[in-house]
Amino acid sequence: MSSGALFPSLVPGSRGSSSKYLVEFRAGKMSLKGSTVTPDKRKGLVYIQQTDDSLIHFCWKDRTSGSVEDDLIIFPDDCEFKRVSQCTTGRVYVLKFKAGSKRLFFWMQEPKTDKDEEYCRKVNEYLNNPPMPGALGGSGSGGHELSALGGEGGLQSLLGNMSHNQLMQLIGPTGLGGLGGLGALTGPGLASLLGSGGPTTSSSSSSSRSQSAAVTPSSTTSSTRTTSAPAAPAAAPATTPSPAVSSNDGASAATSPTQPIQLSDLQNILATMNVPATGEGGQQVDLASVLTPEIMAPILANAEVQERLMPYLPSGESLPQTADEIQNTLTSPQFQQALSMFSAALASGQLGPLMSQFGLPADAVDAANKGDIEAFAKAMQTTSSQKERESSEKKEEEEDMSLD
C-alpha cells in the first residue's frame, strides 16, 4: 500500500518530533467486536505529540515492547475523546471520529483516578486547539503571517509566478490541508489579497493542523501485566457518544509586509488554518461520499484513465506504479480524508482565485468563488467534454487530410 509514501508524515522517521509529549497517560487498548468491546491486557501508553511539521498525533504504544501501534494524525473537530459512562466495570474511554463510524476504545491503567478527567480534557484541548508552532517553550515566531502577503511582491505575484508543479506542491500531500485552510481566511480574504496591493497590519489564523487521519492496525498479541496495574474492565457494550463541537481560538500577530514570501512560507501559513465545517451557501457536498470505491471502480478500469493517473502515483523502489496501486491509493483512508478537506475548502467560496491559477474555465472559477461544488463539477465536466470533442474533430481532420 502506498499511503505512507503519499502522506510522508505517516512514514516512521520521516518527520522529526518533539521529545516532550503534550499529554500522556497509561492506558490499554480495547478491541471492538460487534457491539462489545474487549480489553487488551497489555500495558500501554496513550500520548499526544506535536511533530516538527506542526501536525498533531494521537498515539498508543505498547509499554513493554515500546512499539507504537497506533499513530493518528488529527486535525481540529475531527474527533472527540470522552468517557464511556455506560461501562461500570472499568474506566473506559472512546476516541470517536465525527465523520463516519470509526471508534477507538481505551481503558485507564493509571493506578489513581483523580486525574482521569484532566487527561480527558487535555486530550480534547490539544486535538481541537493545537498549540501554535513555537508556543511550547520556543522563542521563534511561527513564520510569516498571511498579512505579509498583501505587500509588494506578495501573494498575487507569488501565485502568478508559480509553475504548475509548484502549485501542485502547494496543494499536494504536504500542503493539501493548507488548501482547505483557505476557507478560513478572515478580514479581506484571499480574493481581496490577490486583487489588492495594499499591505495589512495583522492577520488572524486558526491554530489547526491538517492531514488525513490514518489508523495503524493493531496487533492482537498479549503480554503479561504486572500486579500493580489496574484490573482490565470486563467486556462492555459499545456505545456511540454524541459528538461535541469544539471551537478553535484564533491567534493574531502583527507582521512586516516587507519580508520576502517563499513558497514554503505560504504553504506553512495555509497549513495552520482551519477548514470550515460548511460553506456559506447551500448544502455542502462531500466529494468523499460521492467518489466511493463502487462508483470509481468502472472508471478506474478504463485503460486510458489508468494511463493518465499513473504519473501521479508515489514513486519509489518499493512502490509499483500499477493499476492496482491506483485503486489502493484512491480508496485509502488518507485519500478519502484529503478529499473531504478539499470539499470543505471548495465549499467555503475562497478558492476561485487559486483555481484561476490553474487555467480553469471561467464557469469553474465562478463556481469556486460561490462555493458551489455541484456547479464546479458540471463546469469541469463540460470543459472536459468540449476538449474531447475538439480532440476527436482534430483527429478526424488529420485523417481526412492524410487520405487526400
Swiss-Prot record:
Keywords: Cytoplasm, Nucleus, Proteasome. Residues 17-130 form the Pru domain. Residues 386-395 have a biased composition (Basic and acidic residues). One of its GO terms (cellular component) is cytoplasm. GO terms for molecular function: endopeptidase activator activity. Residues 248-258 have a biased composition (Polar residues). This is Proteasomal ubiquitin receptor ADRM1. It comes from Xenopus tropicalis. The gene is adrm1.
